[in-house]
Amino acid sequence: MRPLRMVAPPGPEPLLRVRDVTLQYRSGSATVRATQNVSFDVFEGDRFVLLGPSGCGKSSLLKAVGGFLAPSAGSIELAGRTVTQPGPDRMAVFQEFDQLPPWKTVLENVMFPLLAAGRLPRAEARERALHWIARVGLTRFAGAYPHTLSGGMKQRVAIARALAMQPKVLLMDEPFAALDALTRRTMQEELTKLWEEAPFTLLFVTHSIDEALVVGNGILLLSPHPGRVRAELNSHQFGLASGGSAEFQAAAQRIHDLLFDEAPAAPAPGERATR
């Protein structure tokens, strides 16, 4: 009798699959190569961070995932479909405070994409918007206009507006970079709390090593211009309370070395280095 052979069930498919993506754009009369042969996977419920120095193509990759910049080589797939244009399944939050139409109240800003997409009748859009406004702690300000809000409050509105659309992926391009240090930490805490209450898939861009470690459960390290993958590592063991620990500081130094050394060191366990 032949012995039984146990076959492991297949693992989950990535929600977002980026394969060998090279991005180029025009700047005056020149063609600028932002990234070269970048590949990574993001699974449902991941908090995946793109980390690297200024000019490494992080924001360009986010634009490409959003459908605003077409790859000159490679492919991007979301839920098994090639990304060719923007869509409501990808919502973005930027660092600029003027991303909210100033003539609309907080409630109207959060309702706007729901109504524009034709997804919900006005009454249901209002109910969902109020739910997300409450989730980010701004119920008292539902009738306020953006010019009356602080920078952190405006970012909360932008996050509520994006999550109200229930996107497959939330795209965040250095959303807290323009905030003071205390507000930035508060926003990191609130984003983490929102994810813990109801996990969503996050693709987050930053040039802060500490922020990458506390926000992400996975980090892709990109080399200086043009952006190439230096390494990919897990950071699920860290949180906002980890900042002073020896393990956190060692991880931060390791990332710094991988990003900026001319010849990156061999990867530590749990890392994947790429040349």
Which stretches of residues belong to each language-model region?
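Helix-to-loop junction immediately C-terminal to a conserved catalytic motif
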Residues: G66
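Short coil-to-helix segment of the ABC ATPase nucleotide-binding domain corresponding to the Q-loop/switch region
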Residues: W103-F112
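A short, proline-enriched helix->beta-strand linker immediately N-terminal to the Walker B motif
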Residues: A164-K168
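Conserved ABC ATPase "signature" region
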Residues: R122-F141, K193
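Conserved ABC ATPase signature
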Residues: Y145-L149, M153
